[in-house]
Regions:
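A preference for well-ordered globular domain cores
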Residues: 1-165
Length: 165
């Protein structure tokens, strides 16, 4: 459970107990709403996850917000990039975002290729000389699998070929 103190600090229950004790406050057995109210603190409820965005984004916590008198974890779409200076070298938010997207694209491409390779492996048997199948149909399917990486939208939007029957 997260707790918001009078100062606006947000911490977990164990931290709050230590914080209260370190500041001369009382100790208690079970943390209840009544105990927190007496100590001038509030429970922080889990807020709604952020939705929407792009394939590069995810919901991430960004502080707390008060809604109808209760405190909730606030979520935003991330990641959030900011200009940074490390050892005198500036890396802009745009540069970080470009690098992040390239990494995500590479990860997704690797995953799609692994799926494609698995589909190819699963139908290798169709290319054996004595396989009782229409080799031309299967060869066309297998080539379509190999061509998945050339599709517009790769690696995020894939139209998989239909496996022959």
């Amino acid at each position: 459970m997260q707790i918001r103190t009078q100062t606006g600090a947000v911490m977990y229950e164990a931290e709050f107990r230590a914080y209260t004790k370190a500041n001369g406050g009382p100790s208690w057995d079970i943390t209840t709403t009544e105990v927190l109210e007496a100590l001038g603190a509030d429970v922080v409820f889990e807020g709604a996850q952020a939705t929407g965005g792009t394939v590069y984004q995810y919901s991430q916590a960004s502080g707390v917000e008060q809604v109808d008198g209760k405190w909730y974890t606030k979520y935003i779409l991330g990641p959030v990039f900011i200009d940074q200076v490390v050892d005198g070298v500036t890396t802009t938010a745009a540069e970080q975002e470009t690098a992040y997207k390239a990494t995500k694209d590479a990860e997704q491409a690797k995953s799609v290729r692994a799926s494609r390779d698995e589909k190819l492996k699963d139908c290798d048997w169709t290319q054996v000389a004595d396989a009782p199948v229409d080799k031309a149909v299967w060869a066309t399917y297998r080539q379509a699998l190999r061509d998945v990486t050339t599709q517009t939208g790769f690696p995020w939007t894939i139209t998989w070929p239909v496996e022959p029957q």
